[in-house]
């Protein structure tokens, strides 16, 4: 249980934040070459406040300023996976991702260097075009948010995904 005390190696997890941003009934999505359509977000930098990291990721990836309104879900990926791009050759730690429902504040869509497209879609369109299983599940949970966030545990390596548990907290 406290194995890290014996080995003197502190546990390491990535903490990330993502935002399902709504404006006039539409949802903001970005498209990457690797995962297709998804909502903006990313790893929170060490020493950075979670909500500041969320706002920053949304703006950097889309040009849109957004304000978080509620935590829609907490998603824990138990898989340690191989890095890609600049992280190739590394084994990445497990990830805990907080997904927020957000409202549009200002800005115009801008495609960043990391992504191919940015756009606004109806929720039905978003459900059709989001292909990445974890993103699809998180979007579905955020869109159907009823005041209680989902807590989902899964194991994802490459394209395979196994959902282990899903409960409302």
For each predicted feature, which ranges?
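A short coil-to-beta-strand element that immediately follows conserved catalytic motifs
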Residues: 65-74
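Nudix hydrolase/Nudix homology domain
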Residues: 37, 113-169
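Short, well-ordered beta-strand micro-motif
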Residues: 21, 99-103, 120-122
